[in-house]
Structures are given as structure tokens and as C-alpha cells.
Amino acid sequence: LKIIEDIETTPELLTTLTAYLLDHESSMANTAKALCCHINTIKYRLNSIRDNTGYSPSKPADVYPLLIAVAINRMKNSENE
């Protein structure tokens, strides 16, 4: 998917975005806990995602396209397993 192709080469960014949007209802604290890292690490990764994709995971107008992209990516990957 084009919107996330720039972060697909950095697995921790894609994992963070997927966990943040799909699994933890955009909670940085819950995402950090689930990924066993500090909340500042999540903030850094979300900023990196914004810088690489042009979409901010914390900006309401940008969340929908990111959410659709990671949901499709998850479904695509689950079909390949």
C-alpha cells in the first residue's frame, strides 16, 4: 500500500503504527506497554511515521487513511500465513 510503503522497510515503525491504531485505540501509553518500550519511544516513532509518510497518526484528518492502510496490511499478511 502506497501510504505506508515508506515505513514498511522499518518494521518497528509499522508495528508501532499498527499497534497504536488497531490494537490500543491511539493510546501511546498502552502501545508503549504492549511493545515493552518507553512512551517517548512511541512518540519518536509516531513522529518518524509522520515524517516518512506525510500523515500524522495523532492528527484526526490523517488517521483514517493510515488506519485503512494498516488494517489492509494486517489482513494481507494474515492471508499469507
Question: What are the residue ranges of the model-derived segments?
Answer:
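Cytosolic nucleotide-utilizing catalytic cores of signal-transduction proteins
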Residues: 1-81
